[in-house]
Amino acid sequence: YVMGICNGFQILAEAGLLTGKKATTYHTAFEELAAYSVEVLPQKVVHENNIITGAGVSSGIELGLYILKEEFGVAVAQQAADNIEYAIDVTKI
């Protein structure tokens, strides 16, 4: 995977990796992200092909849980969330 969180999208966009794709970032940077010919989605985590983007910095937790869910399953991701006392249903990420 290639990932970007918050304004980290700029590196991916400058490299041309986001052109024509769906992605997210912190809400104040939606217009800047859209200027790179990206379909901006107001979600915490967006996964398209091998690229995963997260919204604000705190979305990094949900992005990490999402990757655990994708690679190791819901049970592992939910256990990780519970272990760090992060109240979330990982099936909704």
What kind of feature is each model-predicted range?
Residues 1-93:
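Active-site-adjacent pocket-lining segments in enzyme domains
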